[in-house]
A protein has these predicted regions:
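C-terminal motif of bacterial Sec signal peptides marking the signal peptidase cleavage site
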Residues: 27-30
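Feature for extracytoplasmic/surface-facing segments of secreted or surface-associated proteins
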Residues: 32-209
Length: 714
């Protein structure tokens, strides 16, 4: 058997040795008979070597299924097979197959189904690598030479190595080929769990496409729900009653007692932030119809352009759950300290980011990982967890434990209203007995920080204690200083595999200098309006500025002096988070939509000039909705979330152009993408979330691979 020949004819005898009937047959064939020689394909199914795998010709019209005219065969102990016919090959390795690490060993049972492919004319070895080549060819018009050249270059191996039994390679090539085979086999195993071949193909395409990404950049903006900025986006699940592609009709807002509000409540204190040249007062905002309204509608008496900063809106852990109201999303106005402003949205087509979303991809089904405000959503972004505060009830923070009402099973119902809380939101904003930063103790006795607390390391809004000569720590005697955290985060996992990463923050260097100055000022400048609780890694014990200064300096970096220069030089780490400074992050209350839009669009323009751009994925999303209404019901997950829907823009040469991606995501889908791309251990919180979603009748969150193509789109 010639394992390197893709097609072979059955042996031909010398004429002098041929029997008379055969000579007569050949003579008849020469005279026009129907006699024909059947071609066949020989090869091996390898990874190790797979015995008893089913092999067939793959359908040219329905990938990952056998051609209807192809008879399937089973592989021998060495993985070898012979098929009649010609074409692409499909190997189904079921749990009845045997996996041999080396030929001749006893082997072991296969525990997870695998679907492997090989392109037509290149099926001498059917493996995860041949599958990857076949997938690339699906996207490049069937060009094997281009697919082989591209994959070999990415892996740093020879094209001959891709087409060989890599188990017999040696040295660096063996290491690289076996590593890629193992990585892709895991992706194939995951995709092969799909019941429908087309779904399995799509899942595998996305997972392999993610492997093309060498640099992931996350730009984490602030406090905008999806409907608030992208509710009018064509093809997206936008503002109900306004965007024709909205998935639902509008559900009117309810009062605190559940009755339908006749009108929206006023915007308490007026619609504009202090210091704006344009002012919309509380009195001007009364009697708005009970429905979403456009803030930047030039024909409205309440017109506010995107350059004007509106007042802030409450956005806290329990408050967000009360506004969502089990998925009805009908109590945003009732449980907002900004009343009717919570129902406002913008014409996002005026933004530069809108144009970028149209050119690349907009995800319209991403929910914040955790309910509530920026503090918790930043923590969830990096660890898929909530910060802990052990023994809070006997600590200086005991007054920060929230008071909540629960049902008979202990499930959260609402924040306990204060004695003076209005009975209708039309008479005033809601008031609570204690909407503190900490949860009551759970069944294990642990307290969790879910609303803003300060880091124990500088920069922190809490100054150093009077006896701290280093000036590098925050005063732990303050009730809102959180003890250093020790949970595993994504940085730990990346560092554990020697994969570089960094959190770049706007104004980090300057603010750190001010915070640690011997004569620290009582306030910090605005701009930049640096936000201490937007720096999640600074809360973790392994970032101690005295005990781990080198680790800290390596991973907590300054945007202004480092990010763009790193990008320009092609030196961004494989994983880079960027947090814009306060006045450029689009946060209502202290930043305008327009300023943040221009800044982030400018950063993307610079990233596209980077030498790393050709294999870069930029994810622009928002930490939370900022108290603004969104109509999409969050899927039911675990006790931390997911919360309200926010926008996400995916920018990369590998992004499917002009896509509105309806795949279900949450903020921690960023962690999933990083985890899958770099083969990291899975954070406990990711597993907990996905299991909870499935247990509640939903599906796990995606990892953005559905928006990616296997070949560059530009």
């Amino acid at each position: 058997m010639n394992l390197h020949a893709n097609t072979a004819l059955r042996p031909v005898l010398h004429p002098s040795l041929r029997p008379l009937p055969l000579l007569l047959s050949l003579g008849l064939a020469a005279c026009g008979s129907n006699y024909a020689v059947t071609p066949h394909i020989t090869g091996q199914v390898i990874g190790s070597y797979y015995e008893n795998a089913q092999v067939c010709l793959e359908s040219s019209t329905s990938k990952l299924t056998c051609d209807s005219g192809s008879a399937a065969v089973r592989t021998a102990a060495d993985g070898s097979y012979t098929l009649d016919g010609q074409g692409a090959v499909l190997a189904t390795i079921g749990t009845d197959a045997i996996r041999h690490e080396t030929m001749g060993d006893a082997g072991s049972k296969v525990t997870q189904k695998l679907l492997l492919r090989a392109p037509a004319g290149h099926s001498a070895f059917v493996s995860a690598l041949s599958t990857e080549l076949a997938q690339i060819m699906d996207g490049n018009g069937g060009d094997f030479a281009a697919a082989s050249s591209k994959l070999a270059a990415r892996l740093g191996v020879s094209e001959a190595g891709l087409a060989s039994d890599f188990n017999k390679a040696s040295g660096d090539e063996l290491t690289k080929l076996k590593a890629e085979n193992a990585s892709v086999t895991a992706l194939v195993a995951s995709a092969s769990t799909q019941a429908v071949p087309a779904d399995a193909l799509a899942a595998l395409n996305g997972a392999l496409a993610l492997n093309n990404i060498q640099t992931i950049v996350v730009i984490y903006a602030e406090n905008r729900g999806f409907d608030n900025l992208y509710g009018l986006f064509p093809g997206a699940n936008g503002v109900p009653g306004v965007n024709p592609t909205s998935s639902t009709a509008y559900v009117p807002q309810k009062d605190v007692d559940g009755s339908t509000l006749p009108v929206l409540p006023p915007t308490w204190g007026g619609m504009t932030a202090a210091g704006q040249s344009t002012v919309i007062t509380q009195a001007q905002s009364v009697n708005l119809p009970n429905k979403p309204f456009q803030i930047d509608d030039a024909s409205s008496p309440l017109y506010l352009p995107q350059s004007v900063i509106t007042r802030d809106l409450v956005h806290r852990f329990y408050n967000n759950q009360m506004q969502i109201n089990g998925g009805a999303n009908d109590k945003f106005a009732a449980y907002s300290d900004a009343g009717g402003l919570s129902m406002g949205y913008y014409d996002g087509s005026k933004m530069q980011l809108w144009d970028i979303a149209k050119q690349y991809a907009l995800a319209d089904n991403l929910f914040i990982g955790a309910f509530g405000g920026s503090f918790l959503t930043h923590q969830y972004l990096i660890c898929a967890c909530a910060p802990t505060y052990p023994n809070a009830d006997t600590s200086v923070a005991k007054g920060s434990i929230a008071k909540i009402d629960v049902d008979a099973k202990g499930n959260f119902l609402r924040l306990t209203p204060s004695a003076t809380a209005p009975t209708t939101v039309l008479n005033g904003a809601p008031a609570y007995a204690n909407d503190g930063a900490l949860t009551p103790a759970d069944s294990s006795g642990m307290f969790y920080a879910v609303n803003t607390m300060q880091p124990a390391f500088q920069p922190s809004s809490n100054a150093p204690a009077s006896g701290d000569s280093s000036k590098l720590y925050a005063d732990t005697g303050k009730a809102n200083t959180l003890p250093p955290q020790t949970q595993t985060n994504i940085g730990d996992l990346l560092s554990g595999k020697n994969i570089d990463w960094a959190w770049y923050a706007g104004a980090w260097k300057d603010t750190t200098a001010l915070a640690t100055a011997s004569a620290r000022a009582s306030s910090f400048p605005n701009p930049p309006n640096f936000q201490f609780h937007h720096q999640p890694f600074n809360y973790f014990a392994n970032m101690d500025p005295v005990k781990a200064p080198a680790y800290r300096a390596a991973h907590l970096r300054d945007f202004d002096s480092q990010f763009l220069s790193d990008a320009s030089a092609g030196k961004l780490p494989p994983v880079a988070f960027y947090k814009p400074q306060g006045n450029l992050n689009q946060h209502a209350g202290y930043a305008s939509v327009a300023d943040g839009d221009a800044h982030i669009a400018g950063v993307i323009a610079q990233l596209k000039k980077s030498p790393q751009w050709k294999n870069m994925l930029v994810i622009v999303t928002y930490d939370e909705n900022g108290g603004f209404y969104d109509h999409a019901a969050p899927p039911k997950g675990d006790r931390w979330g997911p919360g309200t829907r926010v926008p996400a823009i995916l920018v990369s040469p590998y992004v499917k152009k002009g896509l509105v991606d309806h795949t279900q995501y949450d903020s921690a889908s960023i962690l999933r993408a990083i985890t899958h791309r770099f083969a990291l251990p899975v954070l406990d919180g990711l597993s907990t979330r996905d299991k909870a979603l499935v247990a509640n009748g939903g599906k796990p969150m995606g990892d953005f691979s559905a928006a990616l193509a296997l070949v560059p789109q530009e």
